[in-house]
Regions:
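Short Fe-S-cluster ligation motifs
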Residues: 100-135
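Electrostatic cytochrome c docking/interface patches
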Residues: 23-62, 73-77, 139
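The canonical Cys-X-X-Cys-His
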Residues: 61-73, 84-94, 151, 155
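Short Cys/His-rich "knuckle" micro-motifs
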Residues: 76-81, 97-101
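Sec-dependent signal peptide recognition
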Residues: 1-7
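C-terminal capping alpha-helices of c-type cytochrome domains
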Residues: 125-159
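N-terminal signal peptide c-region/cleavage motif recognized by signal peptidases
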Residues: 9, 14-16
Length: 159
């Protein structure tokens, strides 16, 4: 995809941290999805839910999903550094293979669903930052605009 197209689509939100709505982000992702796929017919909550729960192999061979960190129910908060979330879910594998060197803090993962956290998907810079980090960890690539739009569409259906 051409960088100029991406720049144009996100020109609505020229500065980091400027407010947006989930619907505005979806419109931008729809424009990008349409550029990369002329047969794009809209986002799917079903595909978004499937993507959220799909397991992906990470560096150590284990399988993680979005739900590994963000909770099986995205309307609930979750705390890192407990038995259900392995360190590698957030940190990847340390170079020395030793997680003992990583400080153990109880990082709070706020609810991902906008119905439980009204600030979700209202800052396009923050949204892109975390999609880039999390998709890179799980998929070893950027998420596509279709994948991002599908996940946000599904999360918007949760009441």
């Amino acid at each position: 995809m051409k960088p100029a197209i991406l720049l144009l689509v996100f020109a609505l939100w020229a500065s980091p941290g400027q407010g947006a709505t989930p619907e505005e982000l979806l419109s931008a992702y729809a424009a990008l999805a349409g550029q990369s796929d002329p047969h794009f017919a809209g986002f799917s909550a079903d595909r978004g839910r499937a993507f959220y729960f799909s397991g992906y192999r990470v560096e150590d061979g284990s399988e993680l999903s979005c739900a590994s960190c963000h909770h099986e129910d995205p309307r609930r908060e979750q705390f890192a550094h407990h038995d259900k979330i392995p360190c590698r879910a957030c940190h990847g594998m340390p170079d020395n293979g030793n997680f003992e060197d990583i400080p153990k803090i109880r990082r709070q993962f706020l609810p991902l669903a906008p119905s439980a956290n009204s600030r979700r998907f209202t800052d396009e810079w923050f949204v892109e930052k975390w999609f880039r980090k999390n998709c890179g960890l799980l998929l070893k690539r950027d998420c596509t605009p279709l994948e991002k739009g599908d996940v946000i569409t599904w999360l918007l259906t949760l009441k």
